[in-house]
């Protein structure tokens, strides 16, 4: 059993955090909320998605697993106005999801969860540096780097966080000191990452006033932030590109 009502734009923003990496996902639903763990097809990035019942106006659920085509959900949410609510109900007999939004009534077929890639095991990593900053600051650096290169170096020197991109002829670097950051736990680290992935991840992350980056040396980066007015959390894990000598 699953029946819920939620703000349309809140749901749209939440789905975006997943759809930047995957086209379909298994949604584990329980009385404790909604959980998704997914990895992109190239095994480069993972996403952890948790939404509590408090993110919803109404939420009733037993343990169940739904397979959803995210592009289909995004298409449906595209008709929503800012103040619309989305009502969802699982028809257990037909195995379809009924959605009501802005006067529209949809009935969509669910994907068989067994045909969707299994949840990844999220590795436990010891990453010594932590940087907390506004999502807009990371977005600015990514946009500047995209004009120069297809990868970006992130690191910490002393008590400053830097983001750097270098192409064949040009180079750009943004340095943020402790007083320009929300917080920093410094450690001498640096890792290189694909801008294709960072650009996708920053789309939802840039909407957050506070994102947390965890870095090591040539290690994956963890990018964490809250969604749904603090009633949900997102965590990305992005593998590094190893620098050649």
Swiss-Prot record:
Keywords: DNA replication, DNA-binding. Pfam families: PCNA_C, PCNA_N. GO terms for biological process: leading strand elongation; regulation of DNA replication. InterPro entries: DNA_clamp_sf (IPR046938), Pr_cel_nuc_antig (IPR000730), Pr_cel_nuc_antig_C (IPR022649), Pr_cel_nuc_antig_CS (IPR022659), Pr_cel_nuc_antig_N (IPR022648). One of its GO terms (molecular function) is DNA polymerase processivity factor activity. The keyword DNA-binding applies. It comes from the Archaea. Belongs to the PCNA family. Sliding clamp subunit that acts as a moving platform for DNA processing. Responsible for tethering the catalytic subunit of DNA polymerase and other proteins to DNA during high-speed replication. Homotrimer. The subunits circularize to form a toroid; DNA passes through its center. Replication factor C (RFC) is required to load the toroid on the DNA. This is DNA polymerase sliding clamp. The gene is pcn.
């Amino acid at each position: 059993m699953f029946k819920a009502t939620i703000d349309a734009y809140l749901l749209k923003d939440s789905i975006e955090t997943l759809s930047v990496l995957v086209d379909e996902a298994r949604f584990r639903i329980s009385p404790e909320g909604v959980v998704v763990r997914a990895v992109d097809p190239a095994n480069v990035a993972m996403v952890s998605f948790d939404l509590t019942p408090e993110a919803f106006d109404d939420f009733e659920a037993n343990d169940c697993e739904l397979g959803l085509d995210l592009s289909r959900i995004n298409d449906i949410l595209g008709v929503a106005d800012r103040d619309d609510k989305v009502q969802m109900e699982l028809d257990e007999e037909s195995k379809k999801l009924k959605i009501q939004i802005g006067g529209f009534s949809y009935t969509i077929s669910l994907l068989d969860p067994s045909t969707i890639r299994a949840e990844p095991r999220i590795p436990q990593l010891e990453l010594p540096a932590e940087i907390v900053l506004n999502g807009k600051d990371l977005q600015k650096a990514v946009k500047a780097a995209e004009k120069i290169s297809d990868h970006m170096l992130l690191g910490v020197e002393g008590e400053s966080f830097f983001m750097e991109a270098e192409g064949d002829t040009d180079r750009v670097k943004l340095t943020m000191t402790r007083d320009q950051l929300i917080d920093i736990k410094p450690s001498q680290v640096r890792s290189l990452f694909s801008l294709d992935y960072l650009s996708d991840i920053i789309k939802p992350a840039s909407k957050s006033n506070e994102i947390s980056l965890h870095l090591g040396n040539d290690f994956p980066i963890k990018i964490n932030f809250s969604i749904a007015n603090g009633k949900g959390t997102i965590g990305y894990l992005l593998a590094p590109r190893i620098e050649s000598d």
